[in-house]
């Protein structure tokens, strides 16, 4: 049959033609249309075109998003971007991403690395200098960067007030020169920092200079003579710029900005005049360079540092002086007249000009007055606010005002009758001062409780001398006089009289081995719940009660005296008195030796330990597991009898706080609805009609703790809800997988599933007040997931324990499939293990009904737990959960990760080919058959979870029979 060539369209014969994709070609035409290479006879072209494999890949194959090279075979698709297997790496750790990943700003991060975003940099600080005009003054509105203190005599004097305003102005060079005086009450002024002053250089054509007059009176005259006084300005040739801190500083004059001020004159001025120094900024003809300005600022800073050092040295000297010598401030003239009249003497012997130089022997009951610091006080009785206290006096002599008088005694007998001078009034400092605050009420109480002091003062030369005050300035409480304790008399020990050995009773013989064996046999019938120690007590012996002799010691007589009995010990007040029967049992007659000493009684036989009989430990725990009662459950498993074990009352109260919440839909429970509807229809009705079937929690009732785990949709926190440890899963809008519909579906499914089932965690409720911050609360299992338990090789797992864990998972999945729910994400990470090795299945966010799952394609889940039909695009059904359970069974027996050291994006290819993890050689045959039946390629041949539960039950029963035979 003749046909035409697909390339040249000529008719070809049967002997010289090739067929590809139902198209005939000549031999010479059957070549690649791009590289013109010969194609093999069995070539099958893609896209109905004649192209070799290399050319096909170059034109039609997808390119890697990272390397931009074509992808030949297996590729990784993430976020609609294709990668090579080796190119899909984490940006942070540069490792191949296996499993989950995080995506942010078109960058991929592995689940182990956090998305690190550098914090935004703060805006740069730019100092904007004002632009000077020719006919108007401009003021600095923006705050200056730094504060540089200027050397002035005001630094050596305490400031008058800390709230004095500080104003600065810069005036340009004009016809009418204006200067602004800056009053520095705190001895500081603000100037630009050295690295910002260079910006002032190009701010305008005007030139500014800094000058400081000698006093406040000269500041007014500086404005009129600033234009014609070059000494007040500074330039390169100024001595102030060259070396303001030279040897001339040590003399009596100091240089400040080119003006010389006499220190002696300045110190003699009053406080108001010498505490103010003016700084005028006026224009000048020469233009200072940038180096001059930097040099000037450096010298000013150096000058201020030296001044601060001097002030600190002075302050330390004053503090050291105050510690060694206590200075007392005298009362002032501003005191009220009534208070001054109280201290006036009644004797006219002393005149008004007489002064009191010193006191002596003040009352010891009064505490020493505190040191008055050199700070400003608000008490009007001491000083006004505009005055400052001088430095504390170096001597202890307190001088009185002339208005106060003290009578002069006419004789020595009248010395004791003179009234003592009143103590100085202690000021109440302001909150900003650092002086000691005296509690007047406490001082008055101490004075009222003390007796009147004895007259111990002595007047010498019309003055009263004081003893040196204590070095400490703190107010100490009055020391009480120490109590005198008399030594206790030593007890008189009387030697015992000689004893007659014939009258002494003999000690009981020790127990024989036969008696001990009889006591052992008699105690075997008394079984208790805990180990007990039984010590046999010898039979009591009669004792003769005798009182302790109180007579004086006498020589022993030759007659046969009765042996004195030792004194009976008196019981303490804490020990309850014994009954007469108990006293008779405990009384044992002592045995005396010929010398009079007491012979010790023979030691009792060794204690007899009676251990409880061992019973096999129960493996399965009760169904109603409560995590807060884990200690109680552990004790219940360790003890043999369970009747004597009761949970603490506090735990019972905590568990009774949370009432069981049974969800209802239109007044009907889930069991009633499942008779007429499927589970998916019920969930769809709840979500569409927005019916709230779960308990609404208040955020204040939940206490959040540390983060336990984090995933793509949110984080899991450890918390407390009504006295019980809970797990709080938070869904935040910040996560890229956040979806409110998924949250509603998961909460609805967890509410409908029976929370009392032993293999599910208990669900307490959810909170949806904040749409961007949702969370639900469930039971906390502290032991962790099944994967953590399996990978921890230090914890041994018996085969019976492994079977029990597998049975719990199968029972949970059997309950889900019975109501028409498939889990769809069953894996070892979604199985929690309690302290008694009970398995609990969690994470129902991806659960769907069987009917809907048939029309769904694969878009979620972990690749190593997914069945082969999912990679072919088939629907998800119950058999997919069975395949995942087969992988979990292999993990339990092998205690390894499935497909270890293999890229997760290459696992689908291996699963589709039929590659499965290798079953260990020591795995039992029945268990191995169950694993192979669960992960077979044909879904119809996989067993159901009901059959799996029956198989595991038979395996465990056969294992117990083998144990009992042994």
UniProtKB/Swiss-Prot annotation:
Residue ranges annotated for the LIM zinc-binding domain, each copy included: 3-62, 63-120
Source taxonomy: Eukaryota, Amoebozoa, Evosea, Eumycetozoa, Dictyostelia
PANTHER family per record: MITOGEN-ACTIVATED PROTEIN KINASE KINASE KINASE 20, SERINE/THREONINE-PROTEIN KINASE TNNI3K-RELATED
Family to which this protein belongs: Belongs to the protein kinase superfamily. TKL Ser/Thr protein kinase family.
Catalytic activity entry: L-seryl-[protein] + ATP = O-phospho-L-seryl-[protein] + ADP + H(+); L-threonyl-[protein] + ATP = O-phospho-L-threonyl-[protein] + ADP + H(+)
Record carries keyword Membrane: no
Residue span of region Disordered: 208-291, 331-588
GO molecular function: ATP binding; metal ion binding; protein kinase activity; protein serine kinase activity; protein serine/threonine kinase activity
UniProt-recorded name of the protein: Probable LIM domain-containing serine/threonine-protein kinase DDB_G0286997
Composition bias, Polar residues: 232-269, 374-389, 513-526
Binding site for ATP: 708-716, 729
Compositionally biased spans, kind Low complexity: 211-231, 270-284, 331-350, 431-449, 543-560
UniProt KW Metal-binding keyword: yes
Superkingdom of this protein's organism: Eukaryota
Pfam family, one: LIM
PROSITE patterns listed in its UniProt record: LIM_DOMAIN_1 (PS00478), LIM_DOMAIN_2 (PS50023), PROTEIN_KINASE_DOM (PS50011), PROTEIN_KINASE_ST (PS00108)
Record keywords, A-Z: ATP-binding, Kinase, LIM domain, Metal-binding, Nucleotide-binding, Repeat, Serine/threonine-protein kinase, Transferase, Zinc
Domain Protein kinase: 702-959
Bias kind Pro residues: ranges: 419-430, 490-511, 561-570
Origin species: Dictyostelium discoideum (Social amoeba)
A GO BP annotation: signal transduction
